[in-house]
């Protein structure tokens, strides 16, 4: 069976992609060599018996998801749902009269509560109805304070690994009922099993063997987009394998710093990650396109990073060859897309979220003046010209035009 090679699109941060845009993305990544598209939807999909789940959030209807699924099947892409069944669903708790009883604390569901599992079953009944695949990502990442809110009041202080493992078993019983094969993010299980805050720190990994009682059918996804260190990736792959379950890797195509992408760093991190994945062995991989803080960056802006990842996974590290393939697929030059990165490199040096803090810097108060250079205006004027002079924009004329106008604004 062909291993998963996928892209995950974040459709939860106030920017649910239009059906036609998802189809276009699926077409592009299929040409690049990907076989899977994942839709990350925290509360942005219709759920049976839950009218307020995703209400006023631009959620996908069942009809829309069926349309996307049918199209992906037609072109040879497996559409996989990526949801949350423990944390990261803060928006539903705004409907206090409806969901307060299933809220532990923060954005975390209340483990052990019957109504929690009724909600989760409604999620699965919907998903099994609209998706062809039987694969599903059920989340469970970054539930840092699980068991420390309402759960603690009801049950007292307990080992948090035991809490999330019990929850995972209950959720997996539901996935089994619907014939689905679940995968989860690895971070909380590694941290709680080892009783550490930093999963990348040296630790006694033998503790995992004592707690490695995860459901038989679940897979673990090691996610990491923050390093260019091969050894770190290799270490964490081997650590995650100690749970004795299938292991997938999730890298990142950086779209979550603000308005500008970071293809350059994405490529460097991806190179190290894929080399570690190939050497250590994983059961599949995918690359996340997150939209933290309002999805200000276009998901199409990181197509160069995704092109590189697809080719690197095949063993191709010839950048000139990769650029030629990118041109064939998109009708645009690889290096022209990299101009978008330059919004965050005034003066030729990367400054994280530079375009964002310059844009929001109050002209009268100048709170961020200390982070700006007197030459930034000239830099952005030149970038505006570079973007304007791009001749081959393919079907991405609007994208180039948007960034050109943004550079024009930043030069002021």
Model-derived features: positions:
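Feature activates predominantly on carbohydrate-active enzymes
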Residues: 1-177, 183, 248-251, 256, ...
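Substrate-binding groove of N-acetylhexosamine-processing glycoside hydrolases
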Residues: 18, 24-27, 67-70, 76, ...
